């Protein structure tokens, strides 16, 4: 559970950093296509990635509990 909250905090921090960089219009020159996305699209992409990561972690925990291994 601690890892999930750490990942959530990191995702929020990254969102703030990306928003700040996009606001300053540095991102389009550094990354190109990513800079053409709106902030909402960028946020949705980060949220989907985070959600997939949390789902994968839960699946791993389920498998580990079934096999008797600790994570």
UniProtKB/Swiss-Prot annotation:
Chief location category: secreted
GO biological process, one term: regulation of defense response to virus
Leucine amide PTM positions: 34
Keyword Metal-binding: no
Other known facts: Shows a low ability to inhibit hepatitis C virus (HCV) infection in Huh7.5.1 cells.
Family named by the database record: Belongs to the non-disulfide-bridged peptide (NDBP) superfamily. Short antimicrobial peptide (group 4) family.
Protein name: Peptide Ctri9819
Classification lineage: Eukaryota, Metazoa, Ecdysozoa, Arthropoda, Chelicerata
């Amino acid at each position: 559970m601690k890892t999930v909250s750490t990942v959530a905090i990191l995702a929020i921090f990254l969102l703030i950093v990306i928003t700040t960089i996009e606001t300053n219009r540095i991102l389009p020159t550094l990354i190109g296509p990513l800079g053409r996305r709106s902030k909402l699209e960028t946020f949705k992409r980060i949220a989907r990635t985070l959600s997939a990561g949390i789902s994968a972690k839960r699946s791993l925990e389920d498998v580990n509990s079934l096999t008797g291994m600790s994570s």
